[in-house]
């Protein structure tokens, strides 16, 4: 597994995998260098993106794998590589979120992330189940 910074030639892959991304946000991600394409044996297999919260806390906002490659341990590998990248760049904590009805929470807990709060969106334009926040000291 290899994490490579997002580039222009990843456009079609990203658009096929993450339907909420816009042309503008795609370009912003390239410029910000906060998104990686996940590569396995010469093939694009997923996308990982994050942003920095309060100038010092990395917040994972997307880890998406190609549907055909799920269940192979690639998410675990991608998280380990991302956490190594964060440590190498001086970060000591990582934060992420997932809806409580998504399976990803079990992966994150297995990797050492602990629950640290949640947001309720019921009755808002973003009506969805509870958004669960998790953190890990690196």
Predicted regions and their residues:
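Conserved beta-strand segments that form the floor/walls of ligand-binding pockets within enzyme
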Residues: 59, 64, 95-97, 133
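Acetyl-CoA-dependent GNAT
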Residues: 2-62, 66-67, 79, 85, ...
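Conserved acetyl-CoA-binding loop-helix of GNAT-fold acetyltransferases
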Residues: 71-84, 109-110
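Conserved catalytic-core motifs of GNAT/GCN5-like acyltransferases
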Residues: 95-97, 114-131
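Short glycine/proline-centered loop/turn elements that form peptide/ligand docking sites
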Residues: 75, 79, 101-104, 121-127
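Active-site beta-strand termini and strand-to-loop segments that position acidic
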Residues: 39-41, 135-138
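Conserved GNAT acetyl-CoA-binding A-motif
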Residues: 86-98
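Short hydrophobic/aromatic beta-strand or adjacent loop that forms the aromatic wall/cage
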Residues: 33-35, 129-133
């Amino acid at each position: 597994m290899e994490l490579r910074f997002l580039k222009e030639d990843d456009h079609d892959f990203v658009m096929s995998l993450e339907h909420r991304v816009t042309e503008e946000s795609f370009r912003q991600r390239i410029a910000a260098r906060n998104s990686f394409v996940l590569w396995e044996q010469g093939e694009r297999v997923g996308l990982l993106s994050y942003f920095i919260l309060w100038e010092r806390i990395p917040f994972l906002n997307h880890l998406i794998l190609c549907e055909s490659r799920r269940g192979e341990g690639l998410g675990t590998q991608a998280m380990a590589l991302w956490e190594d990248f964060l440590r190498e760049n001086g970060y000591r904590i990582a934060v992420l979120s997932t809806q409580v009805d998504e399976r990803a929470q079990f992966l994150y807990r297995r990797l050492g992330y602990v629950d640290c709060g949640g947001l309720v969106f019921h009755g808002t334009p973003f009506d969805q189940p509870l958004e669960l926040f998790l953190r890990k000291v690196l």
